[in-house]
């Protein structure tokens, strides 16, 4: 009997240990892809349908095959490149060139430059809104967003944001949300009228940079460097739902609706991975180690892989993370 009780106690102890063990995301580095050339980087955009990954790199954009990870092309002459937006229905892509205060338009098939549009000062993040067929370029030093017709490249308007814009997302229903880095706010825009509808504070978060969106629960996931927090917002009311700690120098966020995972990548060299338990509850699964300075990423919604730019011993490298 004593042996039986001891055995049962041991089993229960192991079960308790398993129950208390922290859940893991399963993400780890599965491939390191070296890219020729030196220089910094910023945003990564994954075209899930076309199976391409666009990576900003100094004065050009590197284009990778999303499945083989091979470098398939380069888009040159994009000085101070920051972001890339894809308008697949028009066969066009749009690149912010921060040093020339312009947006460069390119052909998605040939990667050839089609034109250039002058915008505000130091354009940074850029996104395509499928509801209006417009491209929104965030002018970091002009406190504004330039709105471009994706079909013909003409400027349809400029929105005064009242602060320095960082990342932006669209809900596909006529709403655009933009983080203001210096104001620690998320701005709600009517993408049809180009009117500012709301300025929503992100307190206790400060220095708002990264932003992602879940269309099903209508939740925004803002990454804030000040306080090192992810702030979850209601996209309809602007109410702060909850906050969660993340690493330092966050600069990109992503949401995977299939796995119900939220990602926040940070310059401290980690990606915080949260599970969305419900619309209002989020559990930290893991802080996945990447590389110091690897503050941005792109999510492939088909394979659930992450593409993370890094500087590995002086070599520009794309870290591919999978499960």
Task: Enumerate the language-model features and the residues they cover.
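Bacterial N-terminal signal peptides
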Residues: 6-16
